């Protein structure tokens, strides 16, 4: 009996402090089949084809982010007060070919495996085969890492002595700082302009590298503000057509917030 009570306890806790709106959004997320979403990989490929070789690596990555945030599909689902999705809806999972360029077989495994399945369509497989793999197969970080390792290292890896070491993904860590609560990205851009003004190209051998990094930061902040503005504009368009007074008011609030955040 005691064991049974412990098993049921999370359900009791779940019922407290959860509004109907949050419960509905949570159920929508939990009940949606995760799926691969190819848009990011395609937009990133476009950006690299356009900019690679014309700018520094930091600037290339920043321009890619700006291209992606300017072009990616965005949506706001009813009841959401915090907006933003990785894909076009709940549980749509983008791929990151710059880190790891999956083979078609990899994607078939994702679609067919029993645990943590990601649905993959025939169109996804076609785009991966014809568009993504030809460009990214030998450009990905994972390919570069594995190509640099000794045969002994590869043998140990294949034997499972060690496995995932983030060669297929970014760490995803966030620097512990409260600056984002005090300053917007437009403020950070002012900091960058001052830093660029202070660069000493005559005496500092690192000045050019610093300029490239600062320039990339400036572009990345533009990208983030572009995305925020797009969500604000979408919320305002949706509010103009909404008949539910509460949701209409929420959309206007979202639009007002996105007009100043993250800028």
Language model features: what each stretch is:
Residues 177-263:
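Structured, charged N-terminal subsegments at the starts of enzyme catalytic cores
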